[in-house]
């Protein structure tokens, strides 16, 4: 196994300031090397080192930790229950495969939260070793890609049902859905691989940190663009285009009438709202000016925790949007999820345009 190597203090500082898992920068935790460290920092970057104490105040630290804990407490049981219902208790349909894939990606992200919280509480000392430095910080990136690609496929699935219903009726199968999910995970792993390769452990200031291995972070900046384009921009444009064409084809009233549509729209909106600050701040820190980069560093912990929140939201949305809330108190959770994931098209006649619209959406 590769041994830990020494890193220049300036590289370590900047790496820690942009690292997605080592984001809470605390100069006060440094040892006797602090004076030399701050001198080099000010000479290199032109910032007042004392100002960096505000990069992550105690309030931001506490809020982030609370958000992480809530994400874990809601996300693990919620997504586990979705997987149990969709994977074992319901008849297997294309819709249940989509929701099962989303829940798997979200659960993977939620399960990594305790390790991330422990590292934050240890003032970013990395106790998990070199191999986990490659794997653990990449979990959220893999989850992000898998989730957004699944949402994109769901949009294309809805699109084909409306625009090419004959093709969808003949080719929309469980096998194709499963193969699509496999392709989603392969693509997510491939796009996350560069982030895994660049990460390594460094021994500095009497502590071990896990961060990126790149002298000037040019490669990291390029990867930030790749992550934004393939993990946010292209999927967003594709999803908006698909649903825009569907709405134009069917009319806004019919477009909004389906239960499954309302649920999926809420899931899509929640994803992009939770992840947008993450991507925007990442680009600002990589390519923004001095003042904008410092502002981005100050609020970055909240953006990261908000991205994690998305992994616990979907089960909540399934429950509160699957049907009228006043009726939910009379149903078991299992029945609620079954209705949320149901294939409405198998229950409604297609004899009229209105009925066909409802079956698709």
Curated annotation (Swiss-Prot):
Keywords: Cell membrane, Chemotaxis, Disulfide bond, G-protein coupled receptor, Glycoprotein, Membrane, Receptor, Transducer, Transmembrane, Transmembrane helix. Its main location: membrane. GO terms for molecular function: complement component C5a receptor activity; G protein-coupled receptor activity. The keyword Transmembrane applies. It holds the Pfam family 7tm_1. It is found in: Cell membrane. GO terms for biological process: chemotaxis; complement receptor mediated signaling pathway; inflammatory response; phospholipase C-activating G protein-coupled receptor signaling pathway; positive regulation of cytosolic calcium ion concentration. It is a multi-pass membrane protein. Gene3D superfamilies: Rhodopsin 7-helix transmembrane proteins. InterPro entries: Formyl_rcpt-rel, GPCR_Rhodpsn, GPCR_Rhodpsn_7TM. The chain crosses the membrane at residues 65-85, 97-117, 135-155, 178-198, 225-245, 263-283, 302-322. The keyword Glycoprotein applies. GO terms for cellular component: plasma membrane. Signal peptide: none annotated. Residues 86-96, 156-177, 246-262, 323-361 are cytoplasmic. Residues 1-64, 118-134, 199-224, 284-301 are extracellular. Disulfide bonds join 133-210. Glycans are attached at residues 36, 50. Receptor for the chemotactic and inflammatory peptide anaphylatoxin C3a. This receptor stimulates chemotaxis, granule enzyme release and superoxide anion production. Belongs to the G-protein coupled receptor 1 family. This is C3a anaphylatoxin chemotactic receptor. The lineage of its organism: Eukaryota, Metazoa, Chordata, Craniata, Vertebrata.
């Amino acid at each position: 196994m590769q041994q830990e190597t020494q890193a220049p203090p300036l590289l370590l500082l900047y790496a820690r300031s942009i690292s997605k898992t080592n984001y809470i920068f605390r100069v006060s935790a440094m040892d006797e090397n602090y004076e030399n460290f701050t001198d080099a920092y000010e000479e290199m970057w032109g910032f007042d080192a004392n100002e960096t104490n505000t990069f992550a105040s105690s309030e931001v630290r506490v809020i982030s930790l609370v958000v992480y804990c809530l994400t874990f407490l809601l996300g693990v049981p919620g997504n586990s229950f979705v997987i149990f219902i969709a994977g074992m208790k319901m008849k297997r349909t294309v819709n249940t495969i989509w929701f099962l894939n989303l829940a798997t990606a979200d659960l993977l992200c939620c399960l990594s939260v305790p390790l991330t919280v422990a590292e934050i509480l240890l003032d970013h000392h990395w106790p998990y070793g070199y191999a986990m430095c490659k794997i653990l910080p990449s979990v959220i990136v893999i989850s992000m890609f898998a989730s957004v690609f699944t949402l994109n496929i769901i949009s294309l699935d809805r699109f084909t049902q409306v625009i090419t219903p004959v093709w969808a009726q003949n080719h929309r199968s469980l096998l194709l859905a499963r193969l699509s999910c496999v392709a989603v995970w392969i693509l997510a792993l491939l796009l996350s691989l560069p982030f895994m390769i660049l990460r390594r452990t460094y021994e500095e200031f009497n502590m071990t940190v896990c961060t990126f291995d790149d002298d000037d972070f040019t490669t990291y900046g390029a990867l930030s663009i790749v992550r934004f384009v393939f993990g946010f921009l292209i999927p967003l444009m594709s999803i908006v285009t698909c649903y825009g064409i569907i709405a134009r084809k069917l009319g806004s009233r019919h477009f909004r009438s389906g239960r499954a549509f309302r649920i999926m729209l809420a899931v899509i909106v929640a994803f992009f709202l939770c992840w947008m600050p993450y991507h925007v701040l990442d680009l600002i820190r990589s390519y923004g000016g001095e003042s904008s980069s410092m502002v981005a560093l100050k609020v970055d912990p909240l953006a990261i925790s908000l991205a994690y929140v998305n992994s616990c939201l979907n089960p909540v949305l399934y429950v509160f949007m699957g049907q009228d809330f006043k009726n939910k108190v009379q149903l078991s959770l299992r029945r609620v999820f079954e209705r949320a994931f149901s294939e409405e098209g198998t229950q409604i006649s297609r004899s009229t345009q209105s009925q066909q619209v409802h079956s698709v959406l």
